[in-house]
């Protein structure tokens, strides 16, 4: 992560009055529940909602992603919401149920690798059509998978880059000492990854 992105993440953790920039408020609540299913809280580790990761995701997409990515994310979000409506038999983002969202996440992330590769291929083959405004060129599942994968990747990036996780959960040294290339991770950091 670059210093600019890290400062963006830090601002997300300190901002008490926040208005979404890229997503609307209903989408934010819905996506926030998805991020909380991806990284739930436990007794030892705070989850996505406690760390305000949705703020980072919204600001990161708005400030760092390019216009083409904005189109892909918005189009794939629309498809994912349609997919959610079909699978849950609902017609609003306001009355979502966590169990239904969890089932949809399992469907996409626990599917065969070959199915996921097919979705990625389908999405990649239809990028130009999506940019031209035709999301019908890609399957709902392919667009939904792209959206969920993007949100999952950003959630994990935000989690690993958050100050609390960096200082309290991951191995952290503000000024690294000596460099040792081949060491046992269990011995060096008790099996924890280094903070960013």
Name each model-derived stretch.
Residues 26-30, 49, 143:
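Short acidic-hydrophobic sequence patches enriched in Asp/Glu that either
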Residues 52-63, 67-196:
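Mature-region segments of soluble proteins
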Residues 42:
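Short amphipathic, basic-aromatic surface patches that mediate peripheral association
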């Amino acid at each position: 992560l670059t210093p600019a992105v890290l400062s963006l993440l830090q601002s997300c953790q300190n901002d008490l009055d926040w208005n979404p920039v890229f997503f609307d408020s209903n989408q934010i609540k819905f996506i926030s529940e998805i991020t909380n299913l991806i990284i739930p809280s436990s007794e030892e580790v705070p989850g996505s909602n406690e760390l305000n990761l949705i703020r980072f995701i919204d600001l990161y997409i708005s400030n760092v992603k390019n216009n083409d990515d904005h189109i892909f994310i918005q189009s794939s979000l629309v498809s994912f919401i349609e997919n959610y409506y079909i699978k849950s038999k609902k017609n609003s983002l306001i009355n979502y149920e966590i169990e239904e969202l969890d089932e949809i996440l399992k469907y996409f992330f626990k599917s065969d690798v070959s199915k996921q590769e097919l979705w990625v291929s389908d999405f990649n083959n239809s990028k130009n059509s999506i940019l031209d405004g035709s999301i019908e060129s890609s399957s709902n599942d392919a667009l939904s998978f792209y959206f969920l994968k993007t949100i999952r990747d950003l959630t994990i990036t935000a989690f690993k880059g958050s100050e609390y996780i960096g200082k309290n959960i991951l191995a952290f040294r503000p000024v690294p000492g000596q460099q040792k290339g081949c060491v046992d991770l269990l011995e060096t950091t008790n099996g924890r990854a280094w903070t960013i």
